[in-house]
């Protein structure tokens, strides 16, 4: 569930905002700077990462790490005020291949609305979020239908929890279509071991971990570039 300060924002699915990629870039830089070499990739995922798709005004970021070291990662995010979401569904991502551990962080109170999803690099959970995004980017009809569904659902749902529960089933149905497209189009991630750069790899909005001197990788190595 959202923190109390997040509940005050209410539930609204709004038209696509061209500022969202820039908002992602600012947040991604903060994440890169605080995690340093712990982060392998930082990617824009979720509805705000799909041009033309209506979404809640909340930036979703996926961070891939080599190992999900909870103490280290929670400590790093704590230095910039990000809060670990404690709910069970924010600790494990169910996938067809089995559950994948994850950590999800909320921003400091009063900060720009966001969710930071931390998963193990190249895990099935990481792959599925990027596939879902790329499928909607490649299919205008699916994107527009999903956009309309979410706006209608948001207008009927009592709160963010009911909205999320009602959206879960249709999301999995859409995911089946995405998996079918991935097989037909030979979609693969640009960095996947078996993709080799061939097939329908769509370059994602992802950044490698910060490698500049001063970027932190431990609890005391925070290097801030906050605007």
PLM region spans:
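Helical scaffold of the NTase/Pol beta-like nucleotidyltransferase catalytic core
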Residues: 1-43
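Catalytic cores of NTP-dependent nucleotidyl/adenyl transfer enzymes across multiple folds
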Residues: 118-200, 206
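Short, compositionally biased low-complexity segments
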Residues: 1-8, 104, 120, 144-148
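Conserved catalytic core of two-metal-ion nucleotidyltransferases
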Residues: 82-122
């Amino acid at each position: 569930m959202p923190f109390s300060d997040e509940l005050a924002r209410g539930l609204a699915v709004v038209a696509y905002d061209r500022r969202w990629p820039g908002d992602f870039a600012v947040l991604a830089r903060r994440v890169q700077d605080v995690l340093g070499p712990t982060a392998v990739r930082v990617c824009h995922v979720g509805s705000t990462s799909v041009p033309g798709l209506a979404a809640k005004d909340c930036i979703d970021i996926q961070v891939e790490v080599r190992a999900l070291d909870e103490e280290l990662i929670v400590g790093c995010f704590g230095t910039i005020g990000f809060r670990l979401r404690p709910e069970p569904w924010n600790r494990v991502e169910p996938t067809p291949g089995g559950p994948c551990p994850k950590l999800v962080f909320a921003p400091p109170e009063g900060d720009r609305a966001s969710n930071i999803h931390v998963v193990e690099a190249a895990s099935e959970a990481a792959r599925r979020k990027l596939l879902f995004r790329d499928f909607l980017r490649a299919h205008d009809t699916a994107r527009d239908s999903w956009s309309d569904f979410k706006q209608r659902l948001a207008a009927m749902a009592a709160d963010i929890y009911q909205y999320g529960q009602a959206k879960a089933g249709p999301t999995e149905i859409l995911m089946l279509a995405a998996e079918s497209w991935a097989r037909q189009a030979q979609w693969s991630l640009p960095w996947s071991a078996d993709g080799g750069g061939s097939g329908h790899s769509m370059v994602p909005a992802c950044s490698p971990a910060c490698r500049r001197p001063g970027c932190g990788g431990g609890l005391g190595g925070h290097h801030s570039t906050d605007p």
